[in-house]
């Protein structure tokens, strides 16, 4: 037999969670690899009067398909008011001494690939694309087609406009782009969605199992308390062992209304609070299942001080009866512990007879036989 088919859910839980963790780890690794970006160090230099000013900072981000290498050149924007370089006929004012140059292009109007293609056809060594107006210095790794030997970098709108204003004032601006640091974006939108669903599922099942454990703990306490109460309550009910000569074992006497069998010597009977008695093995499960006397419908458990819903707890009470209550005692032990002396029975057991006997017969009957007469003699089941 395959042990995997016979193992319990608890034994399979560690393997299940290990498999789930491995799956999450693989997904996260894939997401992280796809979301790895490289920053760009940019050294921007320009002349102001007789002074040479430069600014160095990690202000750019390489495109996803850009080659990662160092590049330097003069910054050249498109000619005219439209700076997005989406038109294939876009022109650039190239340096006179044929210096390497890098195109400065505004984002928007077309795809990034189109902008890069226009600049590369004019001989640009690299392309710097600055973001939309109103985005500040926000940048992100651009998705574009790969171009051979072309460096593609995005910078913020503020930095791009500063460079553009300097160039429009006639300032000669050069830039050197170097590969910066590698950054891994752990939480892209796919991974975030997956984690949200997974976390919500785990939270639901965790809450569900905690609630089940809490309810089970309360039920366990309830049944333990009920067991103690039932032990105490059933200990209050009298138990008697029938003997030869008792009126109850007479062939003409009434039988047990539960099993419909006649009473026999050495059988154990339990006397209820209503003074009716039956076979102990018959009446105990009956009380636990119905809670009442099968003859007069007296609420036995209520009379013993136990308040509960019998219909909801029938099966559990019967289990408690078989496992916890003193019904497991042998007949000898029950006779020793619970048998009532004949002299005391007369003060506690009443006699219910629909057809009273004559005074002559009553006078000729021994007192002991009178006291041990069946309390339910001549009664019908209600």
Swiss-Prot record:
<keyword id="KW-0256">Endoplasmic reticulum</keyword>
<feature type="compositionally biased region" description="Polar residues">
    <location>
        <begin position="344"/>
        <end position="364"/>
    </location>
</feature>
<keyword id="KW-0808">Transferase</keyword>
<dbReference type="Pfam" id="PF02225">
    <property type="entry name" value="PA"/>
</dbReference>
<dbReference type="InterPro" id="IPR046450">
    <property type="entry name" value="PA_dom_sf"/>
</dbReference>
<dbReference type="InterPro" id="IPR001841">
    <property type="entry name" value="Znf_RING"/>
</dbReference>
<dbReference type="GO" id="GO:0005789">
    <property type="term" value="C:endoplasmic reticulum membrane"/>
</dbReference>
<keyword id="KW-0833">Ubl conjugation pathway</keyword>
<feature type="domain" description="PA">
    <location>
        <begin position="65"/>
        <end position="167"/>
    </location>
</feature>
<dbReference type="GO" id="GO:0008270">
    <property type="term" value="F:zinc ion binding"/>
</dbReference>
<dbReference type="GO" id="GO:0051865">
    <property type="term" value="P:protein autoubiquitination"/>
</dbReference>
<feature type="zinc finger region" description="RING-type; atypical">
    <location>
        <begin position="256"/>
        <end position="297"/>
    </location>
</feature>
<keyword id="KW-0479">Metal-binding</keyword>
<dbReference type="InterPro" id="IPR013083">
    <property type="entry name" value="Znf_RING/FYVE/PHD"/>
</dbReference>
<keyword id="KW-0862">Zinc</keyword>
<dbReference type="GO" id="GO:0016740">
    <property type="term" value="F:transferase activity"/>
</dbReference>
<keyword id="KW-0832">Ubl conjugation</keyword>
<keyword id="KW-0472">Membrane</keyword>
<comment type="subunit">
    <text>Interacts with E3 ligase UBE2J1.</text>
</comment>
<comment type="function">
    <text>Has E3 ubiquitin-protein ligase activity. Plays a role in male fecundity through the interaction with the E2 ubituitin-protein ligase UBE2J1.</text>
</comment>
<keyword id="KW-1133">Transmembrane helix</keyword>
<keyword id="KW-0863">Zinc-finger</keyword>
<dbReference type="InterPro" id="IPR003137">
    <property type="entry name" value="PA_domain"/>
</dbReference>
<comment type="pathway">
    <text>Protein modification; protein ubiquitination.</text>
</comment>
<protein>
    <recommendedName>
        <fullName>E3 ubiquitin-protein ligase RNF133</fullName>
        <ecNumber>2.3.2.27</ecNumber>
    </recommendedName>
</protein>
<dbReference type="Pfam" id="PF13639">
    <property type="entry name" value="zf-RING_2"/>
</dbReference>
<keyword id="KW-0812">Transmembrane</keyword>
<feature type="region of interest" description="Disordered">
    <location>
        <begin position="328"/>
        <end position="382"/>
    </location>
</feature>
<feature type="transmembrane region" description="Helical">
    <location>
        <begin position="190"/>
        <end position="210"/>
    </location>
</feature>
